[in-house]
Amino acid sequence: MPQRAKREAQYRSITDRHGAAIARLAAVYEKDPALRQDLEQDIHLHLWRSLDGFREQCSLSTWTWRVAHNVCARHVDKAVRSRSAGDWIDIDSVEPADQRATPEQATGTALTLERLYALIDRLRPIDRQVVLLYLEDVEAEAIAEVTGLSSGAVATRIHRIKALLAQGFQPEAAS
């Protein structure tokens, strides 16, 4: 198969399999609709341009997430410079959630996707990256590859982030 045809087939595979997830990723990283569309297009452009460099050392899916998150990280890096460190939530200060509580009890009836994404948006960029990949059902090993963290660090962050998000849905936090 000629190189261009192979690249087109790989890109079609990426957009078929991950197109909606890339749109969700851009929506979490950018609230402004016009900038969100630009970010999504930038992700697709980087994916297309980078396909010739894909050496199949990992799955196409893992590689796609790595490229997408690198583009988003650069996008966020620009925004972070204008945001003070006091605006971020520190997951290391979170107490573990009550393990006896059911997910329904922990989150209550006020659980909404909008609230979840608002809480995720307040996380530090690396924590946001981990939780977004987790929410897209990416395995911990692949999250570790994409983020450069160890698998253990990924598991710890996921546990702490889940506890933090659960706290955000407690009745006193919702008011």
Residue ranges and their predicted role:
Residues 14, 18-22, 43, 63-68, ...:
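Residue-level preference for hydrophobic side chains embedded in well-ordered alpha helices
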Residues 1-24, 34-37, 48:
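A short, charge-rich alpha-helical start-of-domain segment used by transcription regulators
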Residues 73, 140-171:
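DNA-recognition helix of helix-turn-helix
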Residues 38-45, 49, 58-70:
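Structural recognition of an alpha-helix C-terminal capping motif at a helix-to-coil junction
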Residues 43, 67, 130-131, 143-145, ...:
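Hydrophobic positions on the alpha-helical face of helix-turn-helix-like DNA-binding modules
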Residues 99-131, 136-145, 166:
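Amphipathic alpha-helical segment used for protein-protein interaction
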Residues 53-55, 66-87, 101, 109, ...:
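Arg/Lys-rich amphipathic alpha helix in sigma70-family domain 2
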Residues 2-5, 9-11, 84-89, 146, ...:
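C-terminal edge and immediately downstream basic/flexible tail or linker adjoining helix-turn-helix-like DNA-binding
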